[in-house]
Design a protein with these regions (language model features):
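Compositionally biased, low-structure terminal segments
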Residues: 11-14, 85, 92, 162
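Common nucleic-acid-contacting/processivity interface regions adjacent to the catalytic cores
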Residues: 1-59, 106-147, 151-155, 165
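Conserved core architecture of multi-subunit DNA-directed RNA polymerases
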Residues: 87, 91, 148-151, 155, ...
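Catalytic palm active-site di-aspartate
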Residues: 116, 160-175
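Metal-dependent catalytic core segments for phosphate chemistry
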Residues: 51-99, 113, 117, 121-122, ...
């Protein structure tokens, strides 16, 4: 993982006294959270699909094994979208035999989600494990997502929309057109 590449993609980011400062906000160490209290109508809820797993892939967090992680993620997404033919050929076809009965596909997608999120979580665990990179002192995968969501907030507000809420990988925009 090259932290400098992540940081350079977001000009203005600073690590000051153990804090992730970007555009005047302390982003914390996990997912970015923002709220404008109030009651809203006609709220668009937008979700960044698999944000942390995709960040891990883009950061090449698992070195030579990153492609396997990506294949598992792509398989899960194909199953979730009902594209079973595609899913049967992904990940070297290893999961094809579990996709003959499409009624059990949701359970397989959920099992893959648990595996994917567990692996991501272990990248920043406080204990030694095969997925933890000791150089990752700042949870770089979550930081990349937080920087992206904070940038997205500014871009949406710049276009005249209110941002009511952000939580890690989702954003709520009242009266979105």
């Amino acid at each position: 993982m090259n932290n400098m590449d992540v940081i350079n993609a977001f000009p203005g980011y600073e690590y000051i006294d153990g804090k992730n400062i970007y555009r005047g906000d302390d982003l914390g160490k996990g997912g970015y959270v923002y709220a404008e209290p109030g009651m809203y109508g006609n709220v668009a809820l937008l979700d960044v699909a698999s944000m942390h797993p995709n960040s891990a892939i883009n950061l090449n967090a698992f070195g030579e094994y990153t492609q396997n992680f990506k294949d598992i993620l792509d398989t899960r997404i194909a199953i979730k979208r009902g594209d079973f033919d595609k899913a049967k050929h992904l990940f070297g076809g290893r999961l094809a035999k579990y996709l003959d009965d499409e009624s059990s596909a949701a359970a397989l997608a959920q099992a893959l989600k648990i595996a994917i999120n567990s692996v991501y979580g272990l990248t920043s665990a406080n204990f030694d494990n095969p997925f933890r990179d000791v150089r990752n002192k700042n949870n770089i995968v979550a930081l990349r997502g937080a920087l992206f969501m904070r940038t997205l907030q500014d871009e949406i507000q710049k276009r005249g929309f209110k941002v009511a809420h952000i939580k890690t990988d989702s954003i709520k925009i009242p009266d979105a057109t």
